[in-house]
Amino acid sequence: MIKILGIESSCDDTAVSIITENREILSNIIISQNTEHAVFGGVVPEIAARSHLSNLDKALKNVLKESNTKLTEISAIAATSGPGLIGGVIVGSMFARSLSSAFKKPFIAINHLEGHALTARLTDNIPYPYLLLLASGGHCQFVAVLGLGKYKILGSTIDDAIGEAFDKVAKMLNLAFPGGPEIEKRAKLGDPHKYKFPKPIINSGNCNMSFSGLKTAVRTLIMSLKELNDAVINDIAASFQFTIGEILSSKVQDAIIAYERVVNDYYENIDYTTQLNLKSFRQDEFKEEPAEHTKVREHRLYPQNSLGSSFLNDAIVIAGGVAANKYLQEILSNCAKTYGYQLIYPPIRLCTDNAAMIAYAGLERYNNKLFTPLNFCPKARWSLEDISK
């Protein structure tokens, strides 16, 4: 049986996981560093890297024990090798490469964003292509996921990442770290229409987003208030979260149009034999019947010929830590339905940083014999579009 060991250390969570060729997660250990960073109100890179050093060995031992697996039984070792806080990325990558060298197992360098991008294939049996909204503490972008290593960024934030905005607003409101869950919790108790915040570049006509102006508006409001009591905090949290939902919803239609255009162009530019092989692959890729939401739909926003319709799915995937926000899940789900799509999101435990997604990305690359030399240099910045370069 094929077993892939995954290692994740790109930010403040130390994670190790083992999955099988059947996409079964045998073990998925995450050691959080929230306590170490809470006093600073954010992640301190030096502390994070040192914690990874002490946590990785412990996490590996726990995963091997829980999965009843020996290192000699591992087929390949996949590790996040960028993008992220470079100290932590180096620690995890070196740990993985040391194991690879010692046990003579293939090493697979994984782009952290690709891990998030492919999580829906691990959990929801989604074939390529699909539209992805990657929303996390470090990124916010719409991506056309065309195939393994084939990604087209349709639009992204031009300033702050969406998760960063959540964390910084939470800090302004004196809420605990990490801020995203705290904002969501407080928002349930507040009035989302109490304060009207700006929605930057909402009518730009493209898929780019901006959250810096929204964050500044919240800070300006807080500074103007005489008192920041619980009721006010709840209302600000609710109004902020509501505005985020409005921004994302307004961009979904732009993203769908761009996605459908990209899919159409992509398949028009490949030869006919490859088209037939891809159609066959999409039918036979998984042993079980594809989920209902992965089947081809006829309606689309972007008028195109019949070629693209053979490949176009009706799934919008949201991944990354912000995907765990249930309010945004509901808002975006309703928005997707308006345009004939269905929103797919991983279970909460796989929304935030984890090693199961890294192991799964490793599995796809293992199956395609895409291995990485041990002298690979970890990267602090690594775009999805540059993976195959």
UniProtKB/Swiss-Prot annotation:
| Reactions catalysed according to its record | L-threonylcarbamoyladenylate + adenosine(37) in tRNA = N(6)-L-threonylcarbamoyladenosine(37) in tRNA + AMP + H(+)
NCBIfam families assigned to the protein according to its UniProt record, in alphabetical order: gcp_kae1 (TIGR00329), RPE3 (TIGR03775), T6A_TsaD_YgjD (TIGR03723)
Q: What are the binding positions for substrate in this chain? A: 134-138, 167, 180, 325
State which Enzyme Commission number(s) the record gives: 2.3.1.234
Q: Which SUPFAM superfamilies match?
A: Actin-like ATPase domain
- Family per record: Belongs to the KAE1 / TsaD family.
What's one GO MF term for it? N(6)-L-threonylcarbamoyladenine synthase activity
- Point out the gene that encodes the protein: tsaD
Q: What is this protein called?
A: tRNA N6-adenosine threonylcarbamoyltransferase
Q: Where does the UniProt entry say this protein principally localizes?
A: cytoplasm
Xref: InterPro entries: ATPase_NBD, Gcp-like_dom, KAE1/TsaD, Peptidase_M22_CS, RPE3, TsaD
Which amino acids does the record list as binding Fe cation?
Answer: 112, 116, 353
Q: Which cofactor does it need?
A: Fe(2+)
Q: Which Gene3D superfamilies match?
A: 3.30.420.40
One GO CC annotation: cytoplasm
UniProt entry keywords in alphabetical sequence: Acyltransferase, Cytoplasm, Iron, Metal-binding, Transferase, tRNA processing
What is the stated purpose of this protein?
Required for the formation of a threonylcarbamoyl group on adenosine at position 37 (t(6)A37) in tRNAs that read codons beginning with adenine. Is involved in the transfer of the threonylcarbamoyl moiety of threonylcarbamoyl-AMP (TC-AMP) to the N6 group of A37, together with TsaE and TsaB. TsaD likely plays a direct catalytic role in this reaction.
Question: GO annotations under biological process?
Answer: tRNA threonylcarbamoyladenosine modification
| Free-text comment on the cofactor | Binds 1 Fe(2+) ion per subunit.
Q: Which organism is it from?
A: Rickettsia felis (strain ATCC VR-1525 / URRWXCal2)
